[in-house]
Amino acid sequence: MLVLVLGDLHIPHRCNSLPAKFKKLLVPGKIQHILCTGNLCTKESYDYLKTLAGDVHIVRGDFDENLNYPEQKVVTVGQFKIGLIHGHQVIPWGDMASLALLQRQFDVDILISGHTHKFEAFEHENKFYINPGSATGAYNALEANIIPSFVLMDIQASTVVTYVYQLIGDDVKVERIEYKKS
């Protein structure tokens, strides 16, 4: 089961669109679920995601026009409970102790957060944490040179194989990370 994880697009305010090389990789009909950390900013970005997969889950980012997106969400995909937040609620941004507290409050196997615009994935106390970064490479409050990135999770039974796609220069680099639920 394939799950696309992305966020912080900031279209059209900070970027015009997803990188063309990412659009070529994101083929309709291949992905079953989309988990988005927010800051899509417009309905057009949401409509584009709906063309990729029927099951789209979005939480509200601090720049989203749609105030109907929830602040947080917990979804179950296969054997995994997955928590989804934008990440502006985590202080300081990306702080491990704050993320671990949210993971325990949500009682999830995987916690997905964004807001920092920087990819990160790691295991902590037998739980998995993912920040997909910014799919467009949009700048953030602290940094202008952001590497565009998104994550594709392949969920099979009690294992998640995470593929991280990063646009470095003109090349899409892919890294593989495996997490087994204990």
UniProtKB/Swiss-Prot annotation:
It is a peripheral membrane protein. The keyword Metal-binding applies. Keywords: Acetylation, Cytoplasm, Endosome, Membrane, Metal-binding, Protein transport, Transport, Zinc. One of its GO terms (biological process) is retrograde transport, endosome to Golgi. It is found in: Cytoplasm; Membrane; Endosome membrane; Early endosome. InterPro entries: Calcineurin-like_PHP_lpxH (IPR024654), Metallo-depent_PP-like (IPR029052), Phosphodiesterase_MJ0936/Vps29 (IPR000979), Vps29 (IPR028661). GO terms for molecular function: metal ion binding. GO terms for cellular component: cytosol; early endosome; endosome membrane; late endosome; retromer complex. CDD domains: MPP_Vps29. The modification N6-acetyllysine is found at K50. The keyword Membrane applies. Component of the commander complex that is essential for endosomal recycling of transmembrane cargos; the commander complex is composed of the CCC subcomplex and the retriever subcomplex. Component of the retriever complex, which is a heterotrimeric complex related to retromer cargo-selective complex (CSC) and essential for retromer-independent retrieval and recycling of numerous cargos such as integrin alpha-5/beta-1 (ITGA5:ITGB1). Component of the retromer cargo-selective complex (CSC). Belongs to the VPS29 family. Component of the commander complex consisting of the CCC subcomplex and the retriever subcomplex. Component of the heterotrimeric retriever complex formed by VPS26C, VPS29 and VPS35L; within the complex interacts with VPS35L. Component of the heterotrimeric retromer cargo-selective complex (CSC), also described as vacuolar protein sorting subcomplex (VPS), formed by VPS26 (VPS26A or VPS26B), VPS29 and VPS35. The CSC has a highly elongated structure with VPS26 and VPS29 binding independently at opposite distal ends of VPS35 as central platform. This is Vacuolar protein sorting-associated protein 29. It comes from Pongo abelii (Sumatran orangutan). The lineage of its organism: Eukaryota, Metazoa, Chordata, Craniata, Vertebrata.
